[in-house]
Design a protein with these regions (language model features):
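Structural signature of the two symmetry-related core transmembrane helices
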Residues: 64-79
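Short hydrophobic/small-residue motifs within alpha-helical transmembrane segments
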Residues: 43-44, 150
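Helix-to-loop junctions at the C-terminal end of transmembrane segments
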Residues: 48-62
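Intracellular juxtamembrane helix-capping segments at the cytosolic ends
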Residues: 24, 115-134, 142
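Extracytoplasmic
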Residues: 1-32, 49-53
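Juxtamembrane helix-start elements in MFS-like secondary transporters
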Residues: 30-39, 103, 142
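Hydrophobic core of transmembrane alpha-helices in multi-pass small-molecule transporters
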Residues: 7, 76, 89-121
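Glycine-rich segments within core transmembrane alpha-helices of 12-TM secondary carriers
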Residues: 134-150
Length: 150
């Protein structure tokens, strides 16, 4: 089960996001550098929040946290899939702000959510749960799990 959680974190990993760069450039009005800056900013913000998620994991346990991570990742993927629609709606709501500025903030939020719930919490909870389940042969169990993730 933990291996499925680790594999579920792929949409939050660089390899899961990078394939959409050209699509995002075309539809958000951002250039490659701005997309990269948004990704970096989302990643840094996520890294600052991850210790709090670790404390919540210690407090609530793996079942609650894997549910929250899965729900958050699902919402992040929904936002990511509807970026163009959300950007159009934002342009109508705040007409004075340029499309690229709105696109930049939307992409920062989207990347923050993808990195936090996918690469961050989902990976952390899944790997820690695997380590808790196995007292003996922990390295072997981790290696078997790694076969499916690699």
């Amino acid at each position: 089960m933990t291996t499925v959680g680790i594999m579920s974190s792929i949409p939050g990993q660089t390899m899961g996001v990078g394939v959409y760069t050209d699509y995002l450039i075309l539809h958000t009005g951002l250039n490659r550098l701005e997309i990269s800056m948004a990704y970096m900013t989302g990643t840094i913000l996520s890294s600052l929040l991850l210790p709090t998620a670790g404390r919540l994991y210690d407090l609530w346990g793996s079942r609650v946290m894997i549910f929250l991570a899965g729900t958050g990742l699902g919402l992040a993927l929904l936002l990511f899939s509807e970026t163009v629609w959300v950007l159009k709606k934002l342009e109508l709501l705040v007409p004075g702000i340029p499309r690229t500025t709105l696109g930049l903030f939307l992409m920062i939020l989207t990347f923050l959510m993808l990195r936090q719930f996918g690469q961050g919490i989902m990976s952390m909870v899944s790997r820690n749960t695997l380590a808790i389940w196995f007292d003996r042969k922990r390295g072997f169990a981790s290696g078997i799990s790694g076969l499916f993730v690699a």
